[in-house]
A protein has these predicted regions:
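N-terminal, polar/charged subdomain of small-to-medium soluble alpha/beta proteins
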Residues: 1-117
């Protein structure tokens, strides 16, 4: 199975377990691995046979920024569901990093990774 990788997409969203944490937008970083058959795209050199990266980015941005979330797990699930609505994509891995989650503890980020198909 082939894959397309979108790595390091940054969005500002209201996310956090407490109401206070959700009061101010926070930076999150999203990686997505999209598994699909790319043989027709590679043999024809035709964009119509692949996935438009900008559309996937816009989808992730809309999901992340238009709703409030308590958990990055929920956000990851919603992004995966949105991506899988494209019938060409057979499997997706979504990683979400929350850099400020443990910043006071000198931790680079907290993260979640889910795989859906």
């Amino acid at each position: 199975m082939d894959k397309i990788i979108i790595k390091g997409a940054q969005f500002m969203c209201n996310i956090g377990a407490s109401k206070g944490e959700r009061a101010k937008k926070q930076n999150i970083v999203v990686d997505a691995e999209l598994f699909l058959n790319l043989s027709k795209a590679s043999s024809t050199n035709d964009i119509r046979h692949t996935i438009n990266y900008l559309e996937i980015h816009s989808l992730m941005k809309d999901i992340a920024e238009k709703k409030e979330y308590k958990l990055i797990e929920t956000l990851a699930e919603n992004i995966a569901i949105g991506i899988l609505k494209n019938s060409s994509i057979k499997k997706v891995v979504v990683r979400i990093k929350k850099p400020m989650a443990l910043a006071k503890k000198n931790v680079k980020y907290a993260a979640v990774e889910i795989t859906r198909n």
